[in-house]
Amino acid sequence: MKAGIDEAGKGCVIGPLVVAGVACSDEDRLRKLGVKDSKKLSQGRREELAEEIRKICRTEVLKVSPENLDERMAAKTINEILKECYAEIILRLKPEIAYVDSPDVIPERLSRELEEITGLRVVAEHKADEKYPLVAAASIIAKVEREREIERLKEKFGDFGSGYASDPRTREVLKEWIASGRIPSCVRMRWKTVSNLRQKTLDDF
């Protein structure tokens, strides 16, 4: 059995980091489903495919809350945290080989480190979601899970956009929260976007 692993939300400033793993012995069924990089699919299509993927594959999902990320980033980089999450998913699935979308600039280094941690064969590559259907499937599961978490957070805290710093709506809401002095727990406080906006808010006074 082979597995694919990918993440969603690595670069967002609001919401969790989600890592998903998909294991399957029949990749052809994934190909026939039309599984491809989640960013190239509409949200509705991702939801449909996620349901189909869960029927034919074993899936594992790991969510890291903003508070947990902030705590861990006191001593680690986001890529080190991701590596730990990937290792946990690999150990849960125990595949013969795991294909991983690499956040590391040197994918071979990530492959080696994950193999040392898990004792299993790992192939880490850039844009693995475009090459391996299993990684594309993991990308879809991760993105769908993140989107659901974001919707839950919006019900609680209001519409803050996508949660990514590049989104003007997200930045505007962050500014309002910072100015009010009440920043909700869904915000990643250690992100540079937050510290930059906090400084700008102070400078405006």
Curated annotation (Swiss-Prot):
Domain RNase H type-2: 1-203
Effect of residue 101 to N: Loss of activity
Residues involved in substrate binding: 46, 143, 146, 164
Pfam families noted in UniProt: RNase_HII
Any single biological process term in GO: mismatch repair
Outcome recorded upon mutating residue 143 to A: Decrease of activity. Increases Km for RNA 30-fold
One GO CC term, this protein: ribonuclease H2 complex
Molecular function GO labels: manganese ion binding; RNA binding; RNA-DNA hybrid ribonuclease activity
Cofactor: Mn(2+); Mg(2+)
Cofactor: how and how many bound: Manganese or magnesium. Binds 1 divalent metal ion per monomer in the absence of substrate. May bind a second metal ion after substrate binding.
Family classification: Belongs to the RNase HII family.
Protein's recorded name: Ribonuclease HII
